[in-house]
Amino acid sequence: MKKQQRLVMRTAILLVLLAAIGYTIYTNFFTEKTAVAVGSTAPDFVLTDLKGHEHRLSDYRGKGVFLNFWGTWCKPCEREMPYMNELYPIYKKQGVEILAVNVGEPKLSVEKFAERFGLTFPIVIDRQDQVLNAYNVGPLPTTFLIDKNGEVKQIITGTMTKEDIERHLESIKP
């Protein structure tokens, strides 16, 4: 009787394992991936900033947008934030907006980070990772350079120097 129970249990485990493998293969090979690519239109979204104001990407049409995905725990993100903050007022006057998308952290953590670095550009929080997933963001930081027409011009993964950020901001001036 025990041998039969073990056989049934092993068969059930094997079936569950095969179903999981089948599902993984199906989702990887047969479902459409909607990764954002250079030359494509940036997916629109609405997120709320630390002050409670809504930011809709499409509201920035006519401006260049430096769309930066980041986290408070991300050391490379921490290194580039002061550079972004320093360049923000200069390029804002020239029609370029910096919009930092925090990836689902508690508002209090993000506020403390912003206060610590004196950040002045808009910071929005993607609480359910919907925007993160829509843009198919992998490692942080990841930045999308979006032109005045809403087209993705470049995707940068990894930390940037001040010179890199300045060059990229220049490239999306309207």
From Swiss-Prot:
Q: Which InterPro entries match?
A: AhpC/TSA, Thiol-dS_OxRdtase_ResA, Thioredoxin-like_sf, Thioredoxin_domain, Thioredoxin_ResA/DsbE_sf
Q: Which Pfam families match?
A: AhpC-TSA
The record places domain Thioredoxin at: 36-174
Pathways per UniProt = Protein modification; cytochrome c assembly
Look up and give the membrane topology term: Single-pass type II membrane protein
Key words of the record = Cell membrane, Cytochrome c-type biogenesis, Disulfide bond, Membrane, Oxidoreductase, Redox-active center, Signal-anchor, Transmembrane, Transmembrane helix
Gene3D superfamilies documented for this protein: Glutaredoxin
Q: Which residues cross the membrane?
A: 11-30
- Set out the biological process GO terms recorded for this chain's protein: cytochrome complex assembly
Per the UniProt entry, the disulfide pairs are C74-C77
Could you name the domain of life of the organism this protein comes from? Bacteria
In its UniProt record, a GO molecular function of this protein is: antioxidant activity
GO CC annotation terms, alphabetical: plasma membrane
What does the protein in this record do?
Thiol-disulfide oxidoreductase which is required in disulfide reduction during c-type cytochrome synthesis. May accept reducing equivalents from CcdA, leading to breakage of disulfide bonds in apocytochrome c; following this reduction heme can be covalently attached.
PANTHER family referenced in this protein's UniProt entry, alphabetically: THIOL:DISULFIDE INTERCHANGE PROTEIN DSBE (PTHR42852:SF6)
Please identify the protein, giving its name as recorded: Thiol-disulfide oxidoreductase ResA
